[in-house]
Amino acid sequence: MRIFSLFILLSLHCSLTGQVISEKLEAYFSFQDCKLFDQSGNGSSGAILGDTNCLCGVRDTGFYFDGSGDALLLVGPLADIFTTSDFSVGFYMRLTDQGAIGGSQVVMAKQANCNLQDAFSIRYTQKTNTISSSISENDTLFTTVQAKLNPNQCWHYITVTRSNTRYSLYVNGVLRDSKTSKARIDLTSTSPLKIAEPVCTIDQPFHGTLDELRFYSKALNEDEINRHNLRPDEILNSDTLIYLGNSFQAITAQSCAQEYSWSPTTGVSDPTASNPVITPTAPTIYILTMTYTDDTGGCLSRDSLMVNVIDPDTLDCNKIFIPNAFTPGSSAGRNDVFGISNPFAVNDFISFEIFDRWGGRVFAAEDAKSQWDGCAQGQPLNPGVYLYRLHYRCDGKERLKTGSLTLLR
């Protein structure tokens, strides 16, 4: 049986691939081995309050807060970002079946009292399944951003950024809300940053797990935010096309789930495995349900994968489609790479090359499915017009298809 391995691009293009953002990283708490230690080397520290436990996290372990007095207190250089400077705060949050716990749960806050004086906070509201964050200097200068969370996810990757007067909220690497204040908000105060501890009498303590907490003295952009997006509890394969009779292996991100269930089960080698081999016979949307059965109340995550199945006997090699423009460096899957639109129609591939306007070759494909990311020798190329040349055989005859494309940035 032939198996197509689907390699997933998890990092950015060219020289940026695989880099972790360390510029202006002021504090980083991975919570690895159940330790509250600043791995940035900048010397922030903290204290664990209550009997906070550690559970499975997105990398190693995360701190679990049971909503009954568990909390963290953080001090040190990380507090310096909460002044008038630009900043970013990013972390992973896993919610649980919280039963009777309702109201506004304080995920984290740097706030002396229940007022708007020099305050920063991030809250989760269970009733509306909403994450929100506020910054305020006083009762006339403040702003709040908020977004609903995906009810089919257990882990959520949350990032807030402040750039001058603009305050933004990203969920799973996607901008969900952004507001502009009438002036830059000064957050300077001596209050420590507290995690999972209520500020106001109507607040509830946070009930869930936190992991991979980072503080930056800069406003990260969307690409930088996504370099830390581990996509927990997701199917990493992109929606794809395969030949009838072929198979592929499903790949899921690291997960803390105890049970897996694929539906439909037809063509799935093991419907209870995280990474089964799938052999579809018709276009199918596969749904993976990941179940947490630990003592935190449990949780369900769901993700889907669309697989189109093509019978090679129905393809016409005389009709090959190639786009005329693309935008490398944009969000993955949004016209960010260039290649043959229907590569399965090229059943006897010879070569596919791209040239700059001086005739220099900047890309040579290994097969019909290869795609160009807009780089040459690891460096992004300038916007402009490029030429392509596809050489292949169709019905036993050699064919040459040429044209131009525009690289946009």
Predicted regions and their residues:
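Short loop/turn motifs at secondary-structure boundaries
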Residues: 311-409
